[in-house]
Amino acid sequence: ILVEPKPNEPIDRSICGTAGHALAVGAYTVDPSRVGLCIESAHSILAGLDPANDMGFALALNKLWGVHLNDQNGCRYDQDKAFGVDNLRNAFNQVKVLYENNFGDRGNFECVGLDVKAMRTQPDEDCYRHLINSKRIFELLLDKVKHFDYEFQAACVKEQNFEKLEMYVMELLMGIK
């Protein structure tokens, strides 16, 4: 059973509104080993959480079996924006946590999906633009993650100079590094 937590919509209440809630409910099933999570970026943001943290939490428990990557502007309705268009740093963190944990390489149910939205007002020829854009942003961020300087990160952590590390990440994302 793959649970995709969502804190609101369609009825503004949920028993499994967050990854933690879903895993707690899953722990009380007849066979908890058969319950995992599909973290959707926008749903974590709707709950006021960080999608990368939700993914890391589920990965630590071997319960992240799928992700739906998209973006969200605040705690409103589920906007299903293209991945990374609202918060590029947040998107980078998600790609980084998935890459660092070899998500998708374990041969089980792990899969990365791009959440789909129906834009009823756009022309037919652009109906897949949301997915094309999400995939492109994911690929660009994956390249940034692959060039991330982990030795520099370790030095910053050792020095407790997190502002220096933050600036490194921002310069990396802006193409300066």
Task: Tell what function each PLM region has.
Residues R13-K177:
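Histidine-acidic metal/acid-base catalytic patches
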Residues I1-E9:
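Glycine/proline-rich, flexible active-site/cofactor-binding loop segments
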